[in-house]
């Protein structure tokens, strides 16, 4: 059934950089399948804007982490959400697509759905890991879920939520065999000798909590592994400025800080010390041994621990269904423990070969041409809506 060609409008919201990446991928697929006159608007980042998206609010207004840290931003977030809902109900786009950011988007999606506007959510929340009660909220809010991981549709189906497995765009973008030598040349690193990539996060709260520990761990590793070099990507000038006091406090470190280029930095590495998050999946797709770590404020950690279901938090372990790389979280994330675990990952060649096999299988499973599959699923929802009109 052909879609209308007159001013098709889709509203979208992405709340953080990883969502911006996913939404931009989806927008690219939609632009190939929908009329050229179609308009896309809402809240998004620079990658979405590059795809012709009209962002009415700055995406970083929605970027928060944890329960405690969010308190100071609640009034501004609620104001933006209220304005967005009023705009949606007044303009009635063909659909609303929330990309990740479930705490913000589910409320908007429910308002859209209640008003007869199809609601689509891209990225299933980790209901299989923690906060399983969210599935009731999903059932009330979401007409169709776009899932990044293959085990999610079966969980949603039990709750009566329509969904499509679309794979992960990172698996499409990252080559099956990373070019470590080329990455080292690009960063001006020696072709030989051990390199460890260190990624302590991109938020001020993350750097404050785990940055000093990561730098202390690097200092220990340099003592124990002469000749080791470190590479650390800084996504923005503000992040580089935030890291500078830690760099100044450890002048002995053989450390290269790159302007962005986190994927190149990880590709150049023999092992990675990384904070928990989507970046751990990227490290797995690059076939890198790693140590996953994270620290959150005590209260946030207690809430997450009480609501957790799985014994692991890192995506490589979740997707494998077992511990394939070590996780050192909260008070277990000491400089000594991080240094020991990371050096083990660096030196253990048998483990490296095993991880390459595990991560290659994972990569092939997630490589689904996500932009095309997600866009096709959205088009089907639009066609179904037109058929009922």
From Swiss-Prot:
Pathway: Bacterial outer membrane biogenesis; LPS lipid A biosynthesis. The keyword Methyltransferase does not apply. It is an enzyme of class 2 (transferase). Pfam families: LpxB. It catalyses: a lipid X + a UDP-2-N,3-O-bis[(3R)-3-hydroxyacyl]-alpha-D-glucosamine = a lipid A disaccharide + UDP + H(+). Keywords: Glycosyltransferase, Lipid A biosynthesis, Lipid biosynthesis, Lipid metabolism, Transferase. Coiled coil: none annotated. The keyword Glycosyltransferase applies. One of its GO terms (cellular component) is membrane. GO terms for molecular function: lipid-A-disaccharide synthase activity; phospholipid binding. The lineage of its organism: Bacteria, Pseudomonadati, Pseudomonadota, Betaproteobacteria, Burkholderiales. This is Lipid-A-disaccharide synthase. Its EC number is 2.4.1.182. Belongs to the LpxB family. Condensation of UDP-2,3-diacylglucosamine and 2,3-diacylglucosamine-1-phosphate to form lipid A disaccharide, a precursor of lipid A, a phosphorylated glycolipid that anchors the lipopolysaccharide to the outer membrane of the cell. One of its GO terms (biological process) is lipid A biosynthetic process. It comes from the Bacteria.
């Amino acid at each position: 059934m052909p879609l209308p060609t007159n001013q098709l409008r889709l509203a979208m919201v992405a709340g953080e950089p990883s969502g911006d990446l996913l939404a931009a991928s989806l927008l690219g697929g939609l632009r190939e399948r929908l009329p050229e006159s179609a308009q896309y608007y809402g809240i998004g980042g620079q990658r979405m804007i590059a795809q012709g998206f009209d962002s009415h609010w700055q995406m970083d207004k929605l970027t928060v982490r944890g329960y405690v840290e969010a308190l100071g931003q609640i009034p501004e977030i609620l104001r933006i959400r209220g304005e967005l809902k009023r705009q949606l109900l007044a303009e009635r786009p063909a659909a609303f697509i929330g990309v990740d950011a479930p705490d913000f988007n589910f409320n908007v999606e429910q308002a859209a759905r209640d008003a007869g506007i199809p609601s689509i959510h891209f990225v299933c929340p980790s209901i299989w890991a923690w906060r399983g009660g969210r599935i009731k909220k999903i059932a009330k809010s979401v007409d169709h879920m776009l899932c990044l991981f293959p085990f999610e549709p079966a969980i949603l189906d039990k709750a009566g939520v329509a969904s499509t497995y679309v794979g992960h765009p990172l698996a499409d973008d990252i080559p099956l065999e990373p070019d470590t030598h080329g990455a080292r040349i690009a960063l001006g690193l020696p072709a030989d000798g051990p390199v460890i990539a260190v990624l302590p996060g991109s938020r001020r709260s993350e750097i404050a909590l785990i940055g000093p520990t990561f730098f202390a761990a690097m200092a220990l590793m340099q003592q124990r592994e002469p000749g080791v070099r470190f590479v650390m990507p800084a996504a923005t000038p503000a992040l580089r400025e935030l890291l500078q006091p830690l760099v100044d406090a450890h002048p002995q470190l053989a450390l290269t800080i790159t302007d962005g280029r986190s994927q190149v930095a990880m590709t150049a590495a023999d092992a990675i010390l990384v904070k928990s998050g989507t970046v751990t999946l990227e490290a797995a797709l690059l076939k890198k041994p790693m140590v996953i770590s994270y620290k959150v404020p005590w209260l946030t950690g207690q809430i997450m621990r009480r609501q957790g279901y799985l014994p692991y938090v890192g995506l490589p372990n979740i997707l494998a269904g077992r511990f394939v790389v070590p996780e050192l979280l909260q008070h277990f994330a000491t400089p000594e423990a991080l240094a020991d675990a990371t050096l083990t990952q660096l030196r253990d060649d048998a483990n490296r070969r095993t991880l390459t096999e595990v991560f290659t299988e994972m990569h092939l499973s997630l490589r689904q041409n996500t932009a095309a599959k997600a866009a096709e699923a959205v088009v089907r929802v639009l066609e179904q809506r037109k058929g009922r009109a």
